């Protein structure tokens, strides 16, 4: 019956949320446990076998920093606290944040950090010809993928919101005194959710390195950034979870050092509507609805996490062919794509990172 079908869909969404909460709890362990095996001399000559590790809930996800350099624990705590600092700059929903004030026309003067990240977001919006668009905020706020009862927004609301999506109408300027300004039409809403975690990870890495950390792993809910090597001439091993796997199965194990691994896909946040239709969180700025894609996961290997964060989403929205074409045009970037049928695509040198 219709009621039974609705109850089935409700139960499936509840089960997904339970699994999502559990996966958030174990995500850092899954990825970082792989980096701790075997338990021998992880790091440089003066590093620890068992890392100084702190886990906290920040940025709506579980954050873990594990330092194999023997530093005071207060350094790790201060590094994690940077998540709060940057959330108060980049959050679209936090009323006290700088971006919230920009979106609500409370200010046109912006900080160096917000200027830098918006500029980066606009660069990738241009690179994708608008397939990725940081002004998607007017649409993304209609879709609440974190709700206990998510639903599809009314079509008229989506249609209206699309009138306020166009990255080309955002202008950044800096005056002779070095003060940054932003200008965009009323009703526009910038959403930096697809790029902020990578930027924050890079800033945390800089802080840790400046404080003497030579070997560490930063994990911001799956955005993984390594500092240095596991030990001299030995890479870290990063396990990339297979999309939609309930058993913790890995898509790949990657050997990397002093680099970033970032994945984006349809499995991160999604729900099923009353008729059983699958909706994921990567929205098309042209239609206002989730992208219909042959891809379910894009994993980027890069030196900087900001680059990986931006490219993982950009390549997903471009699709397999154009996304891989973009990767091949960039120096120092590798990618692994997974299609919905389980087929994996590798950029030219991506396989060199795969653990044999």
Residue locations for each model-derived region?
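Mature catalytic core of soluble alpha/beta enzymes
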Residues: 13-356
């Amino acid at each position: 019956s219709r009621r039974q079908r609705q109850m089935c869909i409700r139960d499936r969404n509840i089960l997904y949320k339970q699994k999502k909460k559990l996966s958030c709890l174990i995500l850092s362990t899954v990825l970082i446990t792989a980096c701790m095996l075997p338990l021998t001399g992880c790091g440089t000559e003066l590093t620890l076998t068992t890392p100084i590790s702190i886990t906290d809930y920040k940025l709506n996800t579980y954050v873990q920093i594990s330092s194999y350099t023997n530093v005071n624990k207060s350094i790790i705590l201060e590094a994690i606290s940077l998540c709060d600092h940057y959330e108060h700059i980049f959050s679209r929903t936090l009323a006290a944040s700088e971006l919230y004030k920009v979106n609500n026309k409370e200010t046109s003067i912006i900080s160096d950090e917000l200027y830098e990240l918006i500029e980066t977001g606009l660069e990738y919006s241009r690179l994708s010809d608008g397939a990725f668009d940081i002004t998607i905020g007017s649409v993304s706020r209609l879709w609440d993928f974190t709700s206990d009862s998510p639903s599809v927004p009314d079509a008229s609301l989506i249609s209206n919101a699309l009138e306020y999506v166009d990255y080309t109408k955002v202008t950044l300027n800096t005056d002779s005194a070095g003060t940054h300004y932003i200008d965009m039409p009323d009703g526009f809403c910038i959403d930096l959710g697809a790029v902020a975690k990578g930027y924050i990870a890079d800033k945390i890495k800089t802080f840790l390195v400046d404080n003497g950390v030579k070997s560490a792993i930063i994990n911001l809910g799956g955005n993984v950034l390594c500092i240095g090597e596991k030990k001299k001439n030995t890479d870290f091993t990063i396990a990339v979870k297979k999309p939609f796997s309930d058993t913790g199965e890995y898509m790949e194990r990657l050997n990397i050092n002093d680099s970033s691994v970032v994945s984006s896909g349809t499995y991160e946040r999604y729900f099923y509507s009353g008729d059983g239709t699958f909706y994921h969180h990567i929205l098309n700025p042209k239609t206002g609805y989730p992208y219909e894609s042959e891809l379910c996961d894009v994993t980027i290997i890069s030196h900087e996490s900001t680059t990986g964060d931006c490219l993982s989403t950009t390549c997903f929205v471009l699709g397999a062919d154009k996304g891989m074409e973009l990767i091949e045009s960039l120096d120092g970037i590798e990618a692994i794509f997974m299609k919905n049928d389980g087929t994996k695509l590798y950029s030219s040198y991506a396989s060199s990172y795969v653990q044999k």
